Amino acid sequence: MRHTLPIAPQFYVTAPQPCPYLAGRMERKLFTALQGEGAERLNNALSQQGFRRSQNVLYRPSCADCAACLSARIDVSAFRASRSQKRAMRRNAHLTRRATSPWATDEQYELFRRYLDSRHADGGMADMDVFEFAAMIEETPIRSRVIEYAHRDTRALIGVSLTDVLDDGLSMVYSFYDPDLHRDSLGTHMILDHIAIAREAGLPYVYLGYWVPGSPKMGYKSRFSGLEIYLGGRWQAMTDPEAHDAIRHPLSTDPIAEQVANIQLPDRWPTGD
């Protein structure tokens, strides 16, 4: 009889590069491959520890001199819509939702390009072509959905969210929308709709990605009640956004070896034949 040892995920660190959120800082990421029959379990386990998915990679910020990026999620049971969020829902009541398999379309890419050119022309995704866009949408080894929002009458595509379905919630991997309708608070509407989907499905959380204190691009996330942040190795309710100011309150940056050692992997990892 031949015995084989479990093949545990291998973790790596990217080279430092300019931070897209805070000027004058450098970012670095800890990452591992997401593949094989254990992909679903690994994604669930690491998402609960602040990791995010990008295609077939799971990553988490691991910067040498900064730890401002905080993984954020909404506790669906604790969420209560504010007045402005209720107005956003009313403004977008004419939109319909359609959930599909992760398959990229020309209409999605056209909307994606308009969104980037208007909102993130200097970002890391600005040069993404149609093939790279298709890879972002379609290369997923786990349960993913493309959720489209369209005008009820004209059928025009207004917004798109690439969403992963986790054991404990929905993870909004990437969202984009019609930049000409920015006054309609479409980004807020899509998050609110995901909260509704999660509630209907009995899922306790909606994962929003990273909240970065001091970054105008990420400030909107702190406006949702029921927000939790991953800090000190555990999820905790965020009570005061000002307490996490990126300049006044730099967070601890543990050595890479210690970070990897503290990662909790799934209890049962598949073995080779």
Swiss-Prot record:
Quote the subcellular location field of this record. Cytoplasm
Q: Which UniProt keywords apply?
A: Acyltransferase, Cytoplasm, Transferase
Judging by the UniProt lineage, the source's domain of life is Bacteria
Where does the record place a coiled coil? none
> What is the first-listed, main subcellular location in coarse terms?
cytoplasm
Provide the top EC class: transferase
> What are the record's GO terms for cellular component?
cytoplasm
Q: Which GO terms describe its molecular function?
A: arginyl-tRNA--protein transferase activity; leucyl-tRNA--protein transferase activity
Q: Enumerate the SUPFAM superfamilies for this protein.
A: Acyl-CoA N-acyltransferases (Nat)
Q: Which GO terms describe its biological process?
A: ubiquitin-dependent protein catabolic process via the N-end rule pathway
A Pfam family recorded for this sequence: ATE_C
Q: Which NCBIfam families match?
A: PRK01305.1-1 (NF002341), PRK01305.1-3 (NF002342), PRK01305.1-4 (NF002343), PRK01305.2-3 (NF002346)
What family is this? Belongs to the R-transferase family. Bpt subfamily.
| PANTHER family tied to this protein | ARGININE-TRNA-PROTEIN TRANSFERASE 1, ARGINYL-TRNA--PROTEIN TRANSFERASE 1
Q: What does this protein do?
A: Functions in the N-end rule pathway of protein degradation where it conjugates Leu from its aminoacyl-tRNA to the N-termini of proteins containing an N-terminal aspartate or glutamate.
Question: In its UniProt entry, what is this protein called?
Answer: Aspartate/glutamate leucyltransferase
Q: What's the source species for this entry?
A: Ruegeria pomeroyi (strain ATCC 700808 / DSM 15171 / DSS-3) (Silicibacter pomeroyi)
Name of encoding gene:
bpt
